């Protein structure tokens, strides 16, 4: 393992240059191998998990899901608050912010973004709960790609650009996750389901987030500072991939639903729905609708 660590990290250091000394010795950041292994284990469970559960009854994780989603809601709220206040204290420039001119605020941003990176490891549990509950239709290419890639991307971000212009996407994403995980936590409580109407708008907010992140990243390309240009190009390419995948999800999920309802009304037989769907819910007249979770 030590030989592998040296080989992998030596190659990365040669390719990208020296790491930011502020994160030296931080949990999971010194070596890339643990992040690779966590990702490989995640992908293995995605592959083997549904097969393992195929002839087994689904596991009801309702109580655990409430606690899990509440925990991620609070963590996301903490990160959003700390990032916003850190950016304000450091007088960050929206158009371009380097990684060394914010003073103590940079240190605060680095600390919060480590938690953001670590939260991507915690969020692997999203997929594991799908597998245990046999909601395999929710384990999509979008879902797996987004979860697996974010952990790895943020390992690199934390080691080379752990503050400065990196704050923007994480700040928006933390806010979106407050909405998203509060929704999924509440959806695990039967009495709350009739009041949950905003799932569609979460996807719209995510798409808006990607567009805003691309806009802010492009600003740094047009009015550059000392933030590495290569990271900005990569960020925009990644945002484009997410816009394509999330946009495809949105069109298939919500446009199809609208078209289906229009046909039902034209036939004079519109069916009643309760305003939301989730893996626990069942609709009236034994009509069951299943939608993919987008993140």
Swiss-Prot record:
Do you know which InterPro entries this protein is assigned to?
Answer: ELO_fam, ELOVL5
Q: Name one GO biological process term.
A: fatty acid elongation, saturated fatty acid
Q: Which reaction does it catalyse?
A: a very-long-chain acyl-CoA + malonyl-CoA + H(+) = a very-long-chain 3-oxoacyl-CoA + CO2 + CoA; (6Z,9Z,12Z)-octadecatrienoyl-CoA + malonyl-CoA + H(+) = (8Z,11Z,14Z)-3-oxoeicosatrienoyl-CoA + CO2 + CoA; (9Z,12Z,15Z)-octadecatrienoyl-CoA + malonyl-CoA + H(+) = (11Z,14Z,17Z)-3-oxoeicosatrienoyl-CoA + CO2 + CoA; (9Z)-hexadecenoyl-CoA + malonyl-CoA + H(+) = 3-oxo-(11Z)-octadecenoyl-CoA + CO2 + CoA
Which locations, inside or outside the cell, does it occupy? Endoplasmic reticulum membrane; Cell projection, Dendrite
The pathway it acts in is: Lipid metabolism; polyunsaturated fatty acid biosynthesis
Q: What class of enzyme is it?
A: transferase
Membrane topology of the entry: Multi-pass membrane protein
Bias (Basic and acidic residues) ranges: 285-295
For the keyword Lipid biosynthesis, the answer is yes
Show the GO MF annotations. fatty acid elongase activity
| UniProt region (Disordered), positions on chain | 265-295
Keyword DNA repair on this protein?
A: no
Q: Which family, according to UniProt?
A: Belongs to the ELO family. ELOVL5 subfamily.
**What HAMAP family does this protein's entry cite?**
VLCF_elongase_5 (MF_03205)
Annotated function: Catalyzes the first and rate-limiting reaction of the four reactions that constitute the long-chain fatty acids elongation cycle. This endoplasmic reticulum-bound enzymatic process allows the addition of 2 carbons to the chain of long- and very long-chain fatty acids (VLCFAs) per cycle. Condensing enzyme that acts specifically toward polyunsaturated acyl-CoA with the higher activity toward C18:3(n-6) acyl-CoA.
Q: Which protein are we looking at? A: Very long chain fatty acid elongase 5
Can you name the source organism? Xenopus tropicalis (Western clawed frog)
The gene behind this protein is elovl5
């Amino acid at each position: 393992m030590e030989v592998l660590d040296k080989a992998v990290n030596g190659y990365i250091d040669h390719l990208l240059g020296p790491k930011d000394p502020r994160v030296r010795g931080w949990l999971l950041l010194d070596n890339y191998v643990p992040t690779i292994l966590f990702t490989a284990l995640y992908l293995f469970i995605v592959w083997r998990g549904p097969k393992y559960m195929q002839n087994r009854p689904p596991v009801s994780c309702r109580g655990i899901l409430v606690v899990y989603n509440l925990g991620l809601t609070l963590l996301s709220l903490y990160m959003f608050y700390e990032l916003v206040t850190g950016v304000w204290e450091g007088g960050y420039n929206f158009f371009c912010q380097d990684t060394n001119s914010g003073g103590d605020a940079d240190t605060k941003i680095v600390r919060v973004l480590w938690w953001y990176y670590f939260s991507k490891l915690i969020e692997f549990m999203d997929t594991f709960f799908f597998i245990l509950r046999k909601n395999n239709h929710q384990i999509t290419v979008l879902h797996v790609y987004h979860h697996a890639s974010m952990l790895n991307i943020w390992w690199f971000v934390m080691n080379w650009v752990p503050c400065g212009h990196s704050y923007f996407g994480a700040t928006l994403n933390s806010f979106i996750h407050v909405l998203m995980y509060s929704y999924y936590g509440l959806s695990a409580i039967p009495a709350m389901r009739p009041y949950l109407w905003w799932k569609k708008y979460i996807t719209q907010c995510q798409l808006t987030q990607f567009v805003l992140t691309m806009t802010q990243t492009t600003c740094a390309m047009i009015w550059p500072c000392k933030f590495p240009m290569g990271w900005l190009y990569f960020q925009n390419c990644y945002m484009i991939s997410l816009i394509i995948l999330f946009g495809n999800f949105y069109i298939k999920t919500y446009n199809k639903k609208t078209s289906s309802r229009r046909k039902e009304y034209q036939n004079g037989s519109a069916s009643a729905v309760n305003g939301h769907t989730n893996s626990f819910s069942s609709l009236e007249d034994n009509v069951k609708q299943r939608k993919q979770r987008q993140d």
